[in-house]
Design a protein with these regions (language model features):
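Catalytic P-loop NTP-binding/switch module of NTPases
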Residues: 582, 586-626
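Short amphipathic alpha-helical segments
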Residues: 169, 245, 400-406, 620-622
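Conserved nucleotide-binding/hydrolysis modules and their immediate coupling elements
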Residues: 538-542, 548-583
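Catalytic cores of soluble metabolic enzymes centered on carboxylation/carboxyl-transfer
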Residues: 303-306, 311-552, 645, 678-703
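Structured functional modules or segments
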Residues: 615-703
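N-terminal beta-alpha lobe that positions the nucleotide/phosphoryl donor
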Residues: 1-279, 283-302
Length: 703
């Protein structure tokens, strides 16, 4: 039977697809489904009821609650939603139930089409320990598992890994024997939270390896494609940050691609694989590689493979599920280079602290498509949230911190990297903090540009790219001045017409002070900046200011001259002369005091603050407050304990990751305001540490 004849016979078996997921991956699957004329069904938690993916589907079914266990991990609720909405197929996306063999069986037993590999294949790869045994038997190179009781100092460092999961959750590097028990326990807790299975195993940790993976696509008739490789070596906390296709290492090492593809196909045949999957390897610079795992689902980074092959991998998943053969014996040849950057709501400068709150604006230039392409030079944007004037996107703490994937394609790696760097640098990302600055720093790094990368890139050899913002102190001051100029124009436009322009005096100069916090809200404040706007009646030069660095800034023009409406999202353009060089800055002002300033100097997010601080906002010395909302998962100290700077006090789980709260000073724990299981908000008092130095100072008297 020809492919066309098969299509006529099989396509009607899928008419309505439910996506058992959320965010950008749900929107991605809906895109292909619409292209194929299929109806779409979303499931959504209470926290997601207003998200774009829930609005875009033809039908949406509520999963009551917010926690993953009661919503997106609730197999019975998802199946009931499919029945109620009339879906005849389920696509699991990635994460949540995507690699749950029991769920796959339940879907099939319910008479629905499962758009994924067989439950048997998922089972075979569901336990990483058993998977390694299967791969070793199939001739695929593997790293051996270690017995906890037999680990010695000479074997360190080792890696604790969740057997049931991926994405860096339930994964801990152990560098001393003293940490082995506590880090293993932490990995177990993360694995139980993320995957419902706390099983972990331990293997040798290769410090400077390279993460290489092969995209598989297999049908139900024995056809297997190795659809190119990807390199995902740029990681933080064992989660990928930047991915690319092809791999710079594989391009450089003769014969490595053939060996990788052979190993990947052997892995697929060993478990009778069908559908989309990925075989992950850890490689060294010599081109040697070791099996890590098979991800029995679509990967987050699948767009770079689509961009370099022209394939629609989700469409192929539909075809395989409908019983089609792969359309040819071999996959398309690779064309050009693609790079993907993951934009996370997190602060890399503070141990990747997750950020929650409002995304006020999320705009990128040069976007040629969303969720498909690009197959011409340009940018593809796969984003979960969307913003509009007066309608910010809200990011909570219940789910993963990834906001979007930004993908570039170009004929060469240098062009693709440069295009992505430029798009990220120029993007208008306003509101809560993200890792955008870090992504640009990585892409512009000389070693990254040369392809000299490894999995330790961010954590050891290039830590500075995580801590240096794109905007330096001078740029912050210049941007704050531009914001103050617009604030003055806004104030003038709202005053009665009988008044002259604010700040004008017949003789002498007028000075107005504006205060800003860098970041959005006091919880994000890294520092504050005060700006004096000086208008002179004796000079045609207009407003000017001398910054602390002695750089002179003069206002040339502001458009519109009478201010902007915060609610419409209309920006103001401010032209400044900075040390004799003209600069154009775009200023967006938002309800609530947020101000986004974008220019070639670097992006700056500010928050307007009152001229005088409210005493109630001042945190007492020694008090530790929650840097993020979340749930307290463990408390390691009690009242009266002596602690030292950096000592672990408690852990908080937010966005499916654990975060350590440490002592900021030596002293005694005088108060504990949080207990295990407590749900907390940003700014919640957690503990108070009395410092000996502070006590000595308080007790001093005059002699």
């Amino acid at each position: 039977m020809t492919h066309t004849e098969q299509g006529a016979a099989q396509t009607p078996t899928i008419t309505t697809v439910l996506v058992a997921n959320r965010g950008e991956i749900a929107r991605r699957v809906f895109t292909t489904a619409r292209h194929r004329g299929l109806s779409t069904v979303a499931v959504y938690s209470d926290a997601d009821q207003n998200e774009p993916f829930a609005r875009e589907a033809d039908a949406a079914v509520r999963l009551p609650g917010n926690a993953p266990g009661e919503t997106y991990l609730n197999a019975d609720a998802v199946l009931d939603a499919a029945r109620r909405a009339g879906a005849d197929a389920i696509h699991p996306g990635y994460g949540f139930l995507s690699e749950n063999a029991g769920f796959a069986r339940a879907v099939i037993d319910a008479g629905l089409v499962w758009i994924g590999p067989s439950p048997e294949a998922i089972d075979a790869m569901g336990s990483k320990t058993e998977a390694k045994k299967l791969m070793e038997a199939a001739g695929v190179p593997v790293l051996t598992n270690l017995d906890t009781a037999e680990i010695t100092e000479e074997m360190l460092p080792v890696l604790v890994k969740a057997s049931a999961g991926g994405g860096g959750r339930g994964m801990r590097v152990v560098r001393t024997l003293d940490e082995l028990e506590s880090e293993t326990s932490a990995a177990v807790r993360e694995a139980e939270s993320a995957f419902g299975d706390g099983t972990v195993f331990i293997e040798r940790y290769i410090e400077s390896g390279r993460h290489i993976e092969v995209q598989l696509m297999a049908d139900n008739h024995g056809g297997v494609w190795a659809v190119g490789e990807r390199e995902c070596s740029i990681q933080r906390r064992h989660q990928k940050v930047i991915e690319e296709a092809p791999s710079p290492l594989v391009e450089r090492v003769d014969g490595m691609r053939d060996r990788l593809f052979e190993a990947a196909r052997a892995a697929a045949h060993a478990i009778g694989y069908s559908g989309a999957g990925t075989v992950e390897f850890l490689a060294n610079d010599k081109g040697e590689f070791f099996f890590l795992e098979v991800n029995t689902r679509l990967q987050v980074e699948h767009p770079v493979t689509e961009a370099t092959t022209g394939l629609d991998l989700v469409g192929l998943q539909f075809d395989v599920a409908a019983g089609f053969h792969l359309p040819s014996e071999n996959p398309p040849a690779l064309d050009g280079w693609a790079v993907e950057a993951r934009v996370y709501a997190e602060d890399p400068r503070h141990d990747y602290r997750p950020m929650s709150g409002e995304v006020l604006r999320f705009d990128f230039d040069d976007v040629v498509s969303s969720f498909t392409g690009p197959h011409v030079p340009g940018i593809r944007l796969d984003a979960g949230p969307e913003t509009a004037p007066g309608r910010p996107a809200v990011v909570g703490v219940n789910y993963d911190a990834m906001l979007a994937k930004v993908i570039s394609w170009a004929p060469t790696r240098a062009e693709a990297v440069g295009r992505l760097s430029g798009a990220l640098r120029r993007a208008r990302v306003h509101g809560l903090g993200t890792n955008r600055d870090q992504l640009v720093r990585i892409l512009d790094d000389a070693d990254f540009r040369a392809g000299d990368i490894n999995t330790a890139f961010l954590e050891s050899t290039h830590t500075e790219v995580s801590t240096v913002p794109l905007a330096d102190d001078d740029t912050v001051s210049v941007s704050a001045f531009a914001a103050a100029v617009v604030a003055e124009a806004d104030a003038t436009s709202t005053r009665p017409t009988r008044h002259v322009r604010a700040g004008f005096r017949l003789f002498g100069d007028a000075r107005t002070t504006h205060r800003y916090t860098v970041g959005q809200g006091s919880g994000d404040a890294e520092n504050g900046v005060d700006v004096d706007v000086v208008r002179s009646s004796r000079s045609s030069g207009g407003e000017s200011v001398t910054l602390g660095s002695d750089r002179n800034v003069r206002l040339v023009a502001v458009t519109p001259p009478d201010g902007v409406n915060r609610d419409t999202g209309t920006p103001a353009t401010v032209i400044l002369e900075v040390d004799g060089i003209r600069r154009t800055l775009t200023v967006h002002r938002y309800p609530g005091g947020g101000v986004g300033v974008d220019s070639a100097l670097g992006p700056v997010m500010l928050t307007e603050r009152p001229r005088y601080d409210d005493p109630s906002d001042i945190v007492a010395e020694g008090a530790l407050v929650a840097p993020m909302p979340g749930t307290v998962t463990s408390v390691s100290v009690t009242v009266g304990d002596e602690v030292t700077t950096g000592q672990k006090l408690m852990t908080i789980e937010a966005m499916k990751m654990e975060h350590t709260i440490s002592a900021t000073t030596d002293g005694t724990v005088s108060s504990l305001a949080a207990a295990t299981g407590d749900h907390i908000e940003t700014g919640t008092l957690l503990a108070v540490i009395d410092s000996p130095d502070a006590s000595d100072t308080d007790n001093q008297t005059d002699n």
